[in-house]
Structure formats: structure tokens, C-alpha cells
């Protein structure tokens, strides 16, 4: 193990908790991995800092917003940093499916804290996004490792979205009893409505979105990971980095905003190598709704959003094999 503490920059609280829990399973010392984010109170943050200074902590997970706080920058300047890992690195690119402006501040902060090797990781990056990541992180001479997007164990299907969509989903889930699955909806309102409909039809389902209180959100996530809950109905706030190997189906209630986002979300199925079914419900109305959402955003952002959306629509409307398209 390298000397010092590695800083892992991660975008979501749920993702940090999941990964810290996993790391602690490999060690008798809970202090080996910690996270700093807005969910911690002052005494918890003081404990984290104490473990780092004592040399116990090998991995520190932080959100970009926490990393840029002056008090955290000042503290980390006095810590030996072994390396920086930028997780979900596609968030740095305007061409990525989940652009987050705060990711653009990572390189200047690294320079301020103290230079160390940098690794950037993502499961979904087009050539344009990869170039953007390297440019923004100052990694022009980086060594690049790529693997195929193709997951032969996943079955992709696009269905027409009709007024009977809820009934179609209930029928599908009941034909696959006890199997773990995720259903993605674009709006929080629809997430809660659909979770209630599924529960009323005897399906062990729960909702998950960023607007819920953190205790309920965490309980629902943990219940899903521990097999107490079969189906999670969620916005895209759920799932990034959640490593549950036996998810058997991923359903998109609405068309995704980009193909990269779609790949990332469907990629949560079949991680154990077993079969995974990926079903998307598509209607032209959804397309119009998403285009409407983009109005009022900066022109450059609108143009990128429209291009990504057109690629997704072309995939949904294609008559050839989904894997080829």
C-alpha cells in the first residue's frame, strides 16, 4: 500500500457511502476509508481528519464541492497525498451525459493542495469526452486504457409507450418474481407515483430521488442492496457506482437524455455475468417534453443537449439490432 492518503473525487453521497462500506469490508480498521460531504456533522468530520492525520486512512472520498471548501483545502495541504482519483470523470465534460460544472475546478484545487499522480475513471466516454477529460485535468500525456462497450449478457428492447405502460411494467415484473430491478423515470413525481402503483399491485418496490429525506433514501438504497426490496423506482440520482451484481432488469419509463447515460444506466444489469433485460419505453411526446425542458438554458448547452437527444431518438426508432445501433 502506498504511503499517504488517496483522494477519490466522487459526485454522489450514495456512491461514496457504498464504496466506503465496501472498502471497510476488506480491513479490520474502519478508519481505512472515509468520506467528507454535507451529510456529516462537525464531530464526524473531526474524527475523519483525526484518522487521516494518524495515518489510518488510505482512501478519502470527497465531492467536488467539499474539495473546494477553503477549510478542507487548508487541511489537505498538510496531508501526504498518494494520488488523486477522479471517479465518474465524464462529469467534467460538457459533452458528457452528466455534466457538472464543479468538476471543472478539480485541477486548480489539485494544484493548490499539492501535485500527485492523477487517474480519471468512467464507464462511458466517447472520444470527444475523453479528450475533454484529459484537457480539463491537464493530463495530455496520460496513458489511456479502454475496453469494449459490448455486454453480450444484456438484452436490449425498445417498446412503444402507450397509456397501458404501468400495466405493461407490472406484467413484466410479475413474470419475473423475486428478481432485482431498477426503473428509471425522468421526474420525481412520476417516481413516487409509479412506486405507489407497484406497491398497490403487490410488488416490493420503493422510490428513490434526490428530493427525499436522506434517512428514507439511505434506507431504500440499503434495502435494495440487501435484497429486502426487489425493485427501486428512481431518477438518475440512483445507481451511479452502486455495485449490486444481480440486477436482472433495468426499465426506462421515459427516453434517456443521451446514449451514454442510457449505457451507464442499463450497465447496472447483469454485472454477475447473468442475463440482464434492458427495456426502454419510447414515445415522440417524451422527445418533445425533453426538448421543451432545454429551453431557457444557455445556447451551447441546448445545442449539445439536442444533439445527444437526437442520437437517442435514432437508436429508439432504429429497425436494426439494438446492439449494432
Which ranges hold each PLM region?
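Cys/His-rich short segments
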Residues: 304-325
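Helicase motor core with emphasis on the C-terminal RecA-like subdomain
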Residues: 1-4, 10, 17-300, 304-307
Amino acid at each position: 500500500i502506498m504511503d499517504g492518503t488517496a483522494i477519490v473525487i466522487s459526485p454522489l453521497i450514495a456512491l461514496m457511502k457504498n464504496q466506503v462500506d465496501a472498502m471497510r469490508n476488506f480491513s479490520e480498521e474502519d478508519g481505512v476509508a472515509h468520506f467528507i460531504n454535507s451529510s456529516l456533522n462537525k464531530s464526524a468530520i473531526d474524527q475523519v481528519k483525526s484518522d487521516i492525520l494518524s495515518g489510518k486512512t488510505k482512501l478519502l472520498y470527497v465531492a467536488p464541492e467539499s474539495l473546494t471548501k477553503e477549510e478542507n483545502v487548508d487541511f489537505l495541504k498538510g496531508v501526504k497525498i498518494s494520488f488523486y482519483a477522479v471517479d465518474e470523470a465524464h462529469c467534467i465534460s460538457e459533452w458528457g451525459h452528466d455534466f457538472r460544472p464543479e468538476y471543472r475546478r478539480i485541477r486548480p484545487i489539485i494544484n493548490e493542495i499539492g501535485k500527485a499522480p492523477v487517474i480519471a475513471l468512467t464507464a462511458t466516454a466517447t472520444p470527444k469526452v475523453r479528450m475533454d477529460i484529459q484537457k480539463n485535468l491537464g493530463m495530455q500525456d496520460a496513458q489511456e486504457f479502454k475496453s469494449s462497450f459490448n455486454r453480450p449478457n444484456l438484452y436490449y428492447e425498445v417498446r412503444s409507450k402507450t397509456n397501458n405502460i404501468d400495466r405493461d411494467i407490472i406484467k413484466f415484473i410479475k413474470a419475473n418474481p423475486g428478481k432485482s430491478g431498477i426503473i428509471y423515470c425522468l421526474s420525481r413525481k412520476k417516481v413516487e407515483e409509479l412506486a405507489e402503483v407497484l406497491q398497490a399491485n403487490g410488488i416490493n418496490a420503493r422510490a428513490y430521488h434526490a428530493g427525499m429525506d436522506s434517512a428514507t433514501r439511505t434506507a431504500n438504497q440499503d434495502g435494495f442492496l440487501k435484497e429486502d426490496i426487489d425493485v427501486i423506482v428512481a431518477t438518475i440520482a440512483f445507481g451511479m457506482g452502486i455495485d449490486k451484481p444481480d440486477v436482472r432488469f433495468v426499465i426506462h419509463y421515459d427516453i434517456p437524455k443521451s446514449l451514454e447515460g442510457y449505457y451507464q444506466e442499463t450497465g447496472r444489469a447483469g454485472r454477475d455475468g447473468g442475463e440482464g433485460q434492458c427495456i426502454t419505453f419510447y414515445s415522440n411526446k417524451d422527445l418533445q417534453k425533453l426538448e421543451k425542458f432545454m429551453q431557457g438554458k444557455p445556447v451551447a448547452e441546448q445545442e449539445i443537449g439536442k444533439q445527444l437527444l437526437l442520437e437517442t431518438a435514432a437508436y429508439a426508432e432504429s429497425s436494426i439490432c439494438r446492439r449494432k445501433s
